[in-house]
Amino acid sequence: MKSMRTFLPSASAVLAVCMLASIAQAGISGSKHDFGQFGWAKNQICLPCHAPHNTIVKDANGVVVAGPLWNHTLSTATYDLYYDAAGQKVTGKVDTNSMLCLSCHDGTVAVDSFGGGAGTQQLTAGLLGTDLTNDHPIGEAAVWPNPNPSFMVDPALRTAAGIMPLRNLADGRAAVGCTSCHEPHNRKGTLHMLWVNNAGSGTTVDGRTVSGSLLCQNCHKK
């Protein structure tokens, strides 16, 4: 019994450490978006994307920037978005939120290009380029209402649930964007910074019970 009494506190301590480690994984600190460890970021986590003063209000086309107090140089690239059912390539604009993500992830702007300065550090991991035809459609290629609404969940339900939000194009139309699936500040602590763990099972926002692909099925009725 003495050895058992010795073991139980030890097991509890291990469990507590594991729980704390799991909690610590959520949030931007220590995530792939934590650039504070690099000298070019001046050891500040937020600065490459946000700043308190003299920030970017509009892009080169006069479109109001979606990100609050945005500090990173925006891309001016044009994107190939998707191949439609007829095999035609959709080339167009992305939503204003995705423009912020692509200012690093399309590879046309250096990661350390912020605060009005020209950077030299090019993104290597997570590089999408400007040809997005092999990625989930976003922006003008993924506008709601969908041509097949019976296969899609009403976006009002998703937004009300606080997950999978639609984003706005410059003309005000709602569309799927990068941040419909990804939470860039890693608040959920999930793989690939997703709003919902896609390996999970459970109840979707419209009440369907699904087994696996929970993130996908919060939008797609399958």
What label would you give each PLM region?
Residues 8-9, 127:
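Generic structural signal for short, flexible, solvent-exposed coil/loop and linker residues
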Residues 22-47, 51-222:
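C-type cytochrome heme-c attachment and multiheme electron-transfer modules
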Residues 1-8:
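N-terminal secretory signal peptides that target proteins for export/translocation
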